[in-house]
Amino acid sequence: MSPITIALPKGRPYAATVRFLREAGLAGPELEPEEGRSLYVECPAQGTRFIIARDSDVPTYVEYGAADLGIVGKNVLMELEPQVYELLDLGYSQCRFVLAAPAGVDPRQLLSGRSRQRVATKYPRMTEAYFNSRGLQVETIFLHGSIEVAPKVGLADLIVDIVETGRTLRENNLVVVEELWTSSMRLIANRAAYRLRAERIGPMVQRLRELVSRRAVAANA
């Protein structure tokens, strides 16, 4: 019986994701807790194998069937809108989407609509949708990283980005103008695999659901 393939995100959420999968009994020692060079890992005892990819690529692996399941942030799903099933909020790596501006600048003036502001972000679709909902026209500047530097160097007036502690904002003399959305890690599934491999995927999803519940109880104890 072929293993279930799960796509995992590189970077910040990787270590927490490995801990989560090990705690659920879906990954063995082959999947190392520290991100290394290996991008494809098999765990025979658990009947799983893992593709380790950029977070923005995880939904693509799942949507096109290269992976049966994937774990990725809600922020990525909201931006890309992939054709996958979102099965479960895993509850960890929680962060906030915020609109931020340089400290000392009146945000009401920036958002008055009298002039077209430039907004730097890694999430252009979501950013444009937000400003459209407020009836404001902005110029969205897409960046892959270092979003917080954009106002300092005159590239943008505002930024939209995800934050956990807000430390990077403070280090770059930025303040939160508004909290837009929240995000956490989600379990997604390929639509065909979810139906055709239900006898394998179903119990795995149930293990993860039970772990989410146990963690929630422990957090509130």
From Swiss-Prot:
Key words of the record: Amino-acid biosynthesis, ATP-binding, Cytoplasm, Glycosyltransferase, Histidine biosynthesis, Nucleotide-binding, Transferase
GO molecular function annotation: ATP binding; ATP phosphoribosyltransferase activity
Main location: cytoplasm
Compartments (UniProt record): Cytoplasm
Enzyme Commission code: 2.4.2.17
GO biological process, one term: L-histidine biosynthetic process
A cellular component term, taken from the record's GO annotations: cytoplasm
Family indicated by similarity: Belongs to the ATP phosphoribosyltransferase family. Short subfamily.
Record-given protein name: ATP phosphoribosyltransferase
Organism: Symbiobacterium thermophilum (strain DSM 24528 / JCM 14929 / IAM 14863 / T)
Top-level taxonomy: Bacteria, Bacillati, Bacillota, Clostridia, Eubacteriales
